[in-house]
């Protein structure tokens, strides 16, 4: 949903674009991300965070028909200067170039697809939490030197309405969205 090219998302949703066949290197990179996520959750627990719904126990959050997302965890206590819980947890690993762009521009400007993901995870319906989530702790780890970036992402209901409109157009739309770019990269 957060991909800037809605045409690509529209086609992928309908299985009308080539299915990416991930090879060994990419599968290992995915595995690195999963392992680093587990390590970060352990680190957060060790400094006093109450974090749950991690790993294989992630919450399943429905934001629209056929659109589900899963935060990497839910924090119930431990973040300095945060009074309202629960707080979603989202973590990514990045190469140096993407990490430094994130540091300079923040999540929304450097990785809008991750910002959109965080918004969706705060908005959607789930059966486990009894209260709404109003922010997300986004953490990125630089794969080159293990630097950590952290940012609190506040829920943005007006922006979420735009995401939902995109989701409805992708799921229920009958016409192909405009091209984002003719550049294949």
Report residues per predicted region.
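A short mid-domain helix/strand-loop element embedded in enzyme catalytic domains
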Residues: 91, 95, 141-144
